Regions:
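Positively charged n-region of N-terminal signal peptides that target proteins for export
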Residues: 1-6
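Bacterial N-terminal signal peptides
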Residues: 7-19
Length: 141
């Protein structure tokens, strides 16, 4: 019993003092502010078009070729986050919640671009029109 107590105490202490995974930033410095949920952005997309803002969602897809885009999803709505001018990339195994900073656009998806996304990047077949965020930075939480 005397040996068990120190072992138990050490185990509990290591669990509580284990480092918490820090957020990872990619691209330009992330500005401070409140992020708009992707579902909320989708419902008012035309009102938000063109103005840089923070957008939040869960990563559901990542470009498998270069990590140059991710898809963020929230409550059944999604937006493809594209790295502006290919200015940054994210790890191909990125997952979890993320915040992107960039300009929201509602963009038609050409057949050529759809083919590129599916064949080269491993994406799901996109709709004829998609919500897109041209981002200067992304933070994976």
């Amino acid at each position: 019993m005397n040996c068990l107590l120190p072992t138990l105490a050490a185990t509990l202490l290591s669990v509580f003092l284990a480092p918490v995974a820090a957020a990872a930033d990619f691209g330009a410095p992330m500005p401070d502010g409140e992020a708009v949920d992707i579902a909320a952005a989708a419902s008012g997309a035309t009102a938000r078009t063109g103005e840089p803002a923070l957008y939040r969602g869960r990563i559901t897809e990542v470009c498998r070729k270069q990590g140059c885009w991710v898809v963020l999803e929230s409550d059944g709505h999604s937006a493809r986050v594209m790295a502006k001018d290919h200015g940054f990339s994210v790890p191909e195994d990125a997952s979890g919640e993320a915040i992107a900073y960039g300009a929201l656009e509602v963009e038609p998806v050409s057949p050529e671009h759809a083919r590129h996304l599916v064949e080269d990047d491993g994406a799901s077949a996109p709709a004829a029109q998609e919500l897109r965020i041209v981002a200067t930075s992304i933070r994976i939480l």
